[in-house]
Every structure is written in C-alpha cells, then in structure tokens.
Amino acid sequence: MIAITLPDGSRREFPGPVTVAEVAQSIGTGLAKAALAGKVDGNLVDTSYSIDRDVALAIITDKDADGVDVIRHSTAHLLAYAVKELYPDAQVTIGPVIENGFYYDFAYKRPFTPEDLAAIEKKMTELSRKDEKVTREVWNRDEAVALFESMGEKYKAEIIASIPADQEIGLYREGKFVDLCRGPHVPSTGKLKVFKLMKVAGAYWRGDANNEMLQRIYGTAWAKKEDQEAYLHMLEEAEKRDHRKLGKSLDLFHLQEEAPGMVFWHPKGWQVWQAVEQYMRGRLTAAGYDEVRTPQVMDRSLWEKSGHWQNYKENMFVTESEKRDYAIKPMNCPGHVQIFNHGLRSYRDLPLRLAEFGACHRNEPSGALHGLMRVRGFVQDDAHIFCTEEQIVAEAKAFNELAFSVYDDFGFKDVAVKLSLRPAQRAGSDEVWDHAEEGLRLALRACGVDWEELPGEGAFYGPKVEYHIKDAIGRSWQCGTLQLDLVLPERLGAEYVAEDNSRKRPVMLHRAILGSFERFLGILLENHAGALPAWLAPEQVVVMNIAESQAEYAENVVQSLLKQGFRAKADLRNEKITYKIREHSLQKIPYLLVVGDKERDANQVAVRARGNVDLGVMPVSAFVERLQQDVTNKA
C-alpha cells in the first residue's frame, strides 16, 4: 500500500502507484478539475506525476501562489507555441517566470511590432480554447539535441547540449509544439484563460553583450480576471507616478549619458535630499551612533583582505596611480573596520555604532540602470555595530524598533519582515550559525513582529533581516537590512580586549534603514505622486500678491517664514492670480498664500492647501502654527 499524507494531516492509502490527478479525483471531482499541479514532499510536479512511495502531497490550484507560478510558466510556453504557429521561422530560446508574469526570448529576422503582439495574443486565446493536453516526455540528451537540430532550433539544441549526457531531459508537448522544460505545467492549455502581452524589448542570448540580440516578449498571467485588472490598474498608476517624469516636471534632478547611473541633483531635489539626510542624522545621533567619514578610494590590498577583490571586482570601479591599484568603494564596511581597528578597543567600548552617509559606486550593467532606482553612484544610510555575542539581541531589537519608527515617519505603515537563513555554502560552524539565527529570531520576537523565513537565502557570512515597505499603490520595496557578519571582523583583524584580558573578535552588524538614498527618494516620490508632505517638500509655501501694492507685504511674510526655518518664496510677477495659483499647484506646493489689500491691512493671509483646498483667511501667526504642526507631525 502507498500512503499519501495530505496538508490537513489526513492519510489516504492506494494499492499501487497513483498519479497526483488520481489522488485529487479520490478527494473530490471539484478538486480534480481545479488541480494545476502537485507538491510531493515539497517538490512541485505535474498532475500526471506517478507516486510509487509514501509521500506528503498537496494539490496545487489557482488559489496557491505556486499555482499562479505554474500558470505563468505554462503561459510562457503558450506564447512560444503561438509565435511558432504565426512565424514558423522564429527560433525559441528561454521563457521563465518573473514577478507578476513571464517573458520568452525569440530569434527572428525582423522586430516584432505592436500589431504582431496583438496577433500573437489572439492566437494564444485560440490555442487556449482548443484545450490541448500538455504532456511530459523524457528523452536522453543526444536524442533531444538531434530533435531540436532537425527542427532548426539551434538555440534550444545548444542549451540541451550543455546539459550532462547522463541527465534525463524533460520535454513538454502541447499540440504541434514541443519545448524543453523542467516543469511542472498545467494539464491542458484550457487552464490558461487570463493573460496579456505587455511589450517587446531586446535581450542578448545568454545575457552576453557579445552574443546575438534576441527579442524578448513580456507578458502577464493570472488566475482570475479581476486580479489581472487590478494589476493593470496598478501599472497605470505607476506610470502616472514614475519618478523620472516627476523629477523632470518638478525640476528635482536629471540624468544624462555623460554620467550613466549618476544623478544631477537640482536645487529643489537637493533640498528634499537634505531634509531626509538631516532627519536621519538626528535619529541616528539620538540612537547612540557616531557619524564617521571614510575614503572614497582605497588600495587593492584592503579589498583583497576583505574578499571584495576576489568576489566583487567586476562590480567595482578600479584605477591605477603610481603603479598601485585602487578601487572606488562599492560599500562602506571595510572602512569602518579600519576605524574600529585604529587603537585598542575594550569590551567597555562595545557596542560601538559607526554611521556614515557613505557615497558608494558600483559598476552596474548599463542595461540595468533605471532612474533613481538602479544607479551606479549612490549614498547609503550605512552603519555598522561592533558588539559582543551577548549584545546581539539587544542591538537587533533596538535597530528593528528604529527602522519601524523611521518608516512610519515617512508614511510607510505596512512593513513586511523577512529573515534569510544559512545558505549551503557558508563560513562559520553550525553552532555559530545556530546562535546567530536564533539571536535574530529572539530580537524579532521581542519586538512583537511577524516575519517570514527564507531558508538558504542568507549571505555566506551571516543571516540577514530584510524590511519590505508597501507603497500607496501596493508595490513592495526592500529597503532596510540587518546583516550579521561572522567573517569580515576576522578577515580584517578586528579584535577587542575582553573582561578576562583575552583578545576576542567583535560581532559586526551591517545595517541600513533607507538603503540607497537615491532609490528611497524615488520610492518616496512615487508613493506620494510627487506631492511630498510639508516636512519634506522642497518648497513648503509660496506667497503671491494680487497687485503691485501688496508686493512688499508678500515679501515680508516670506522673510518671516524663512527666519522661522521654513522653505518659502514669493511670486511677485505681474500675472493674474489664477495663473500663479495654477502654476504652483502643478508644482505640488503644500501651501499657497494669497495677499490682497485686505490681507495686507489686517496682517493676514488667504490660505490654500494642496489639492485646491480653501482654508480661508487667517493671521500669519495662525498659519505658522499650522505649518509648524505639519512639520512636527511629519504631515
């Protein structure tokens, strides 16, 4: 008998081998119809997979995240099937699942047009309605290579030829189309009902710029129509909020080809930057951090000791001077260890918290650069905590509380926490990792937060806590990290004198809350659609006169606001007041003050809040009180 244990703990027994589909049928017709795949002892398999031993089994439907991934993977193959039907000369390459969708790369003699995409999507719908069965076949490698070569599919043949000869090859067949894939796939094309092709872009074969340029068709696929509609609406909102457009329209920053991946900050954009930096500086000082500054360029020997030269060199900008090799720092940690090492440290000095708004540079591929979100030159709110093993929990707890408080001040109330655990390849003993992982768990538990654990996702030198913030349109952004480093202090010779006068290695906690300033400012701009709260807005107030006779009064109001620390300016142009109001409203200024003769004579201002909200006429002192409250409350 074969015993199948289901997710609810119940068991079903079968006299002999049984497929996932047959198990689903034994539970109920509805489940059998909904089944997309199975999960056998944690591994995803097709519904046709035959079970010949005792296992734990979950039936995967479109209600499961794994089920949606199977739908997307299968839709990528449906896309390739449709392309081959319409354009037989096109050659197929690869088609993986990505976040919210999939893509497939093709080699074809001409670029695909928007009209082609519409025709391909229509053909995909036709193939879905045919509800053709999707079957898995096992081939040996050489026969599979010969098959694809005979079909003129040189790219697919090349992929298969790179697989070890003794490894079985899985091919999936639907109708006239056959493709290489590890699977699993939906049982038939009729399961694929909700999809949309999004765009076409260029992509190099195997990601190598020296290879041929292919065409990558992107698509999205979902279990339900309403899920896809919500996603497409979110994309429309994201397009409106694109920080690159806002940067231009609000005159905050620009990028140009002469400095790829590096930002030219304009006065208003730099004002926002300074508001964020000064806020973070105040929070770090209050939390017991000492701010430091380390060199931008350091000798190769230091990067060799830290391991960056061996493991990270291709992402570093390097240079030579007087026959010595140097690198522009891609991160701040080795420099902070040098400060720790400068002088003899005692256990009484710990924990030592060193913070730096450190400018770093990483040689990211030009094709990966994206506005402020992916750059080559960036500044981090970086800090490193040197502490004893006994202090890990308290320091991690304090950091977690600080991070949540900062996110709350910036308006991010929904924060997800993930704990990345030991990878297969790692430094340090299991005992040390047990202690490190449990220390981070204890800290998170002490803070009362829920977290998701990601086995195998930690760095080789230690486990990591990640902080993911959700923005106004539901997108998740990973910003903060807390990483426990068991390796760098040893590589760079960091030590302190313990209470018993022995020499010990400190534990090193790498931590950041915002991450890259550039990226965080991009997230902020998109979250608020450019309408930054008053405490962050580059211009908090614009004072406008109706006629020349109020110009002096308007200027006096501005000077009064400036002296009280607010960011204000006067618009004294000889233009209609409606024109001025409209122009500054488009610049998303939090408050517009209008002054005429009545306001001047009474020492008052007519106040309009952003969004064309008329707050009426009030004394200047009352407006100042309101604005100060906004700034204090981070409104």
From Swiss-Prot:
Molecular functions per Gene Ontology: ATP binding; metal ion binding; threonine-tRNA ligase activity; tRNA binding
Cofactor section: Zn(2+)
Binding annotation for Zn(2+): C333, H384, H510
Main location (coarse class): cytoplasm
SMART domains per the UniProt record, alphabetical: tRNA_SAD
Any GO BP annotation: threonyl-tRNA aminoacylation
GO cellular component: cytosol
Reaction(s) the record says it catalyses: tRNA(Thr) + L-threonine + ATP = L-threonyl-tRNA(Thr) + AMP + diphosphate + H(+)
Subcellular location: Cytoplasm
Family membership noted in the UniProt record: Belongs to the class-II aminoacyl-tRNA synthetase family.
Quaternary state and interactors: Homodimer.
The protein's name: Threonine--tRNA ligase
Natural source organism: Cupriavidus pinatubonensis (strain JMP 134 / LMG 1197)
